[in-house]
């Protein structure tokens, strides 16, 4: 039998076989937590020294060693070993190599259970802040673009069919509002992430006279977890993030679907920058919206990370179980995927060309003004249901002879109602149709201006 040399190996007579060790190790991915692990250790050892659990001299030596490791990490000079399993054991092993056996006192009153939970809270807190900044940029980009296109008229769609003409600025502001709610969800997520598990130890707390409020302050958490079992057992703050990330990616994906359509030959509403397009290896003419397609495709990946962690957690008894090692890769992957997707979307919007004339022209060769005619008839005293039927029949007739509602002679309109006047032709123009939709939150130009003004105030307040 080979003696077990792990830091936890005292109870064991033999070592893990190499292939089993590789299966159980997490250092290949949890090394992303290295800066957070060292930061948490710095707070922990500071507290140990100030509460006289270890001597001030010992605390000073450990802090000096941690500073050396932090400098080496920033310089890319730390090498991690699979034999040390995870980031926590790797850091402790490296610290021992730097300062000797006194490094072993760092783990006093601490378990890897509260250690990893603390690292993950610190990591996610950091990434939530970064993500919200990127969302702020995206939302600002949308407002700027909307302001430039208040008077750009495009078809509004239901069932992918032309429905009513709208302001392109209004369409963009719809996404602004979606991404604002995404930001609010991340802010609420931050509240549940901004808690300190440090000091919960393995599951039951510790017999040492630790000061959890001190480490909470040192790590800039809002407050410590009030229950040690809860602190080390749950990953709901990550599940909440993955859920919020999934909703955010869904919004990005919907927008990308529209961008993909709009830059097609059939629409030609926009032209994407070459920076966000690719070509074909066989078809020389192709300009493909690959970045938008990738965001759309990666949405399923983020959904998968959410379902994966929910499945891991669904039957776990309290407290810690090794299954929880599977909580990290999906979180890391989703953080990276969502962050780059937000950045790409913002830059794609900033650099695209809007083909205003084509958007406008597409509203002149359709029947998206049919509701305007029905509303006009209703305003002249025709019951709306009757007006709806009349206009439906007119659309059918026009469809058969290749004409549009604005082509019908006034004389024919006046056979329907003598109250119809020449102003009907102005009413039927797309610009007028948009302008008249001036109800609160509507697509009317004045309403879009109000939406933009409100958005500017919101952005300024953040």
Curated annotation (Swiss-Prot):
The EC number(s) this enzyme carries: 4.3.2.1
Pathway the protein contributes to: Amino-acid biosynthesis; L-arginine biosynthesis; L-arginine from L-ornithine and carbamoyl phosphate: step 3/3
Protein's UniProt keywords contain Cytoplasm: yes
InterPro entries: Arg_succ_lyase_C, Argininosuccinate_lyase, Fumarase/histidase_N, Fumarate_lyase_CS, Fumarate_lyase_fam, Fumarate_lyase_N, L-Aspartase-like
Main location: cytoplasm
Cellular localization per UniProt: Cytoplasm
Stated name of the protein: Argininosuccinate lyase
Species this chain originates from: Streptococcus agalactiae serotype V (strain ATCC BAA-611 / 2603 V/R)
Lineage, top ranks: Bacteria, Bacillati, Bacillota, Bacilli, Lactobacillales
Gene: argH
